Every structure is written in C-alpha cells, then in structure tokens.
A protein has these predicted regions:
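Basic, glycine-rich
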Residues: 3-15, 19-23, 128-148
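Active-site metal-binding core of divalent-cation-utilizing nuclease and nuclease-like domains
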Residues: 64-100
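Basic, amphipathic alpha-helical patches used to engage nucleic acids or provide basic targeting signals
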Residues: 88-91, 95-146
Length: 148
C-alpha cells in the first residue's frame, strides 16, 4: 500500500496543525468580515464648536454633519453627483427650522483644500445659503456678531 497507518496519522496531524497555525496567524480568513462599523459623528474639535454654538444660540437648533443633499438639489443627476457625498459641519436653524447659516470648521486637514472648499461654498451660496468658515473656535460674542 502507498500509505501505512502511521504515515496516514502523521499526514492528518500535519494537516490539522497547518490549519491551526494558519487560523492563529490569519484569523480574518476564518471569521466573517463585518461590513459596517460605527464611527464618531463629530471630532473632539467639532464637539467643542457644537457646544459653543449651543451656548451662543440657546434658542436655535444646531445640526451637525448635515448632508448637502438635505440642503440642496438640482434637476440634473450629474450636478447632484457633485454634492451627493458632501457633508457640512454645522447648520444653524431658527425656531421655525429655517436655515440661518451654514458653518464650516476648518481644521489643519483643510490646508491645501482651499479651492475645494470654495467650490463647496459656491454650491451652497448659489442655493441661497450663507456660509461662514472658521479655523478656530470663535467666542460666543464673535458667533453672535457673525450670525446677525
């Protein structure tokens, strides 16, 4: 016979040991991949701005991470595709839920993206919104002055 019993047992043992070693070294091969993961809604920097906006405008509604598609639309699909994945940092609403202004908080990740930011602002401005950009968290007084 090609294999005697001891060779067969050794072969099975080596196969099982190999499978065990591969599963230890590469567990992702044997576990089901998660398709969705939770993530933070806003950064720590943005959360400080959110708190400042709530302090500056206690009688207004402050929304964070609002999709452009909730704010603007266009008849042509190719134009909608230009903004359908874009999100604005904050939207300030009055008591009747009308948009007063859109606020963008530019952290250091925006350096070198000034043209892209200008294009984003232009879309919102063309729809009739006011857009205010800050690179630092402004004082309550500054916010109230800017949103008059």
């Amino acid at each position: 016979s090609v294999f005697n019993l001891s060779q067969f047992i050794f072969f099975v043992f080596v196969c099982l040991a190999t499978i065990a070693l591969v599963s230890l070294l590469f567990p992702h091969l044997f576990t089901r991949q998660k398709k969705f993961y939770p993530k933070r809604v806003i950064t720590a920097f943005e959360s400080r701005m959110f708190t400042r906006l709530k302090e500056a405008f206690p009688h207004h509604h402050i929304l964070a991470q609002v999709a452009f598609s909730a704010l603007i639309t266009h008849d042509q699909m190719n134009m909608r595709n230009q903004f359908n994945r874009k999100v604005t940092d904050f939207v300030v609403l009055d008591r009747d839920y009308n948009v007063l202004t859109i606020i963008e908080l530019d952290d250091p990740s925006h350096i070198g993206k000034e043209q892209e930011d200008a294009e984003r602002d232009a879309m919102l401005i063309a729809a009739g919104y006011t857009v205010i950009r800050y690179t630092q968290i402004p004082s309550i007084r500054q916010l109230q002055r800017d949103l008059r």
